[in-house]
């Protein structure tokens, strides 16, 4: 074979090789089978196939890749759901404490002139109450020290048995109930004709109930175990001002030493011929800083000072109906009402109940 013939054969072989390689590249580089097969036939005939371009040396040129910007497939981003804070359950509004009752005066006399308990008295009385509570005094009991003006049935007993009508003074009803059982009790320290000195005399104590050498006041405190002691004396202490003062102070000292709150009450009469004994009672209450139940201020407003024909004992009022104007003209009616007022004040302001 001549050299010329050999050269021609090599050229033909080279062309065949190039064509074969180009065909293989076309098969490899054509669109993906999945997408092409899925496309409709019409789409495959959309345009002529571009001729294969050959580069130098007869090798077909590789197609320049077309940069297709990546299609941003929208990834479904979960919209943040704002988790609501738990709804605050409103706290129940505290039930407002009942407003303290507005005390009512009597017959135009201001409450503060009848029940004398300024802050220093309340503070001192709380100390006495605390001492009594520590040794077991009964906060629901009170006792009486007095003469015939404080005997049953006229003094306080109706508040144990009924009927009664407090009317405008109905705010006192809780105090009635708190001290139930003491109102109508026969006190060992209440006797007809009792003086301040006989209240401290063991010979006036109740036989069989009281211990040897025990005074009526001491005996009553031991037997009834009260937290409060109402002291209503002075009518029978005539012409003995100095002794009345010292005897009353002895009763007050006995009560305080026993952890019992002494409450001093004034009287409506002028049996001693002046108002000396009431002045003494007021002075003792101030000196000891203990509650003063100044009934005498109300007696000033009553016809005949609320006294019976003997000018010593009070006139009675059986009905105990404080809606009846007659009640406000009678000694025992006002005596009982104001005594209940001072018990209420001690209970609320000192005992804290």
Regions found by a protein language model. Give the residues of each.
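N-terminal Sec-pathway targeting helices
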Residues: 2-15
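Active-site segments of SGNH/GDSL-like serine hydrolases
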Residues: 232-236, 249-281
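Ser/Thr-rich, Proline-interspersed low-complexity disordered segments
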Residues: 35-113, 120
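Loop/turn elements at helix/coil->beta-strand transitions in domains of secreted/extracellular proteins
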Residues: 138-141, 224-230, 256-263, 288-291
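Catalytic His-Asp segment of secreted/periplasmic serine-dependent ester chemistry enzymes
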Residues: 269-353
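N-terminal module-boundary/linker segments of secreted carbohydrate-active enzymes
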Residues: 96-150
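Conserved SGNH/GDSL esterase-like catalytic core that processes O-acyl groups on lipids
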Residues: 114, 135-243, 316-320
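Hydrophobic single-pass membrane-insertion segments
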Residues: 23-37
């Amino acid at each position: 074979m001549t050299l010329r013939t050999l050269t021609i054969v090599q050229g033909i072989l080279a062309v065949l090789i190039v064509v074969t390689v180009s065909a293989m590249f076309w098969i490899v580089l054509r669109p993906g089978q999945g997408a092409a097969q899925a496309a409709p036939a019409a789409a495959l005939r959309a345009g002529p196939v571009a001729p294969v371009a050959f580069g130098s040396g007869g090798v077909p040129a590789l197609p320049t890749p077309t940069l297709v910007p990546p299609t941003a497939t929208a990834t479904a981003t979960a919209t943040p759901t704002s988790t609501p804070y738990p709804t605050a359950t409103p706290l129940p509004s505290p039930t407002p404490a009942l407003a303290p009752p507005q005390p009512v005066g009597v017959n135009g006399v201001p409450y503060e002139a009848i029940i004398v308990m300024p802050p220093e008295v309340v503070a001192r009385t709380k100390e006495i109450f605390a001492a009594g509570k520590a040794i077991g005094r009964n906060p629901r009991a009170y006792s009486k020290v007095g003469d015939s003006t404080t005997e049953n049935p006229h003094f306080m007993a109706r508040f144990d048995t009924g009927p009664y009508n407090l009317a405008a003074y109905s705010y006192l009803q809780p105090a009635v109930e708190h001290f139930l059982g003491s109102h109508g009790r026969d006190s060992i320290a209440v006797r007809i004709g009792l003086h301040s000195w006989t209240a401290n005399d063991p010979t006036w104590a109740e036989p069989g109930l009281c211990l040897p050498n025990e005074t009526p006041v001491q005996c009553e405190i031991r037997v009834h175990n009260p937290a409060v002691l109402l002291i209503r004396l002075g009518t029978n202490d005539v012409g003995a001002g100095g002794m009345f003062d010292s005897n009353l102070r002895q009763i007050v000292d006995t009560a305080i030493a026993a952890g019992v709150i002494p409450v001093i009450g004034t009287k409506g009469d002028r049996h001693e011929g002046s108002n000396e004994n009431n002045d003494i009672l007021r002075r003792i209450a101030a000196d000891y800083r203990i509650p003063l139940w100044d009934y005498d201020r109300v007696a000033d407003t009553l016809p005949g000072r609320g006294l019976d024909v003997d000018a010593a004992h009070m006139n009675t009022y059986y009905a105990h109906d404080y809606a009846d104007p007659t009640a406000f003209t009678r000694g025992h009616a006002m005596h009982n009402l104001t005594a209940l007022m001072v018990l209420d004040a001690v209970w609320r302001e000192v005992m804290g109940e």
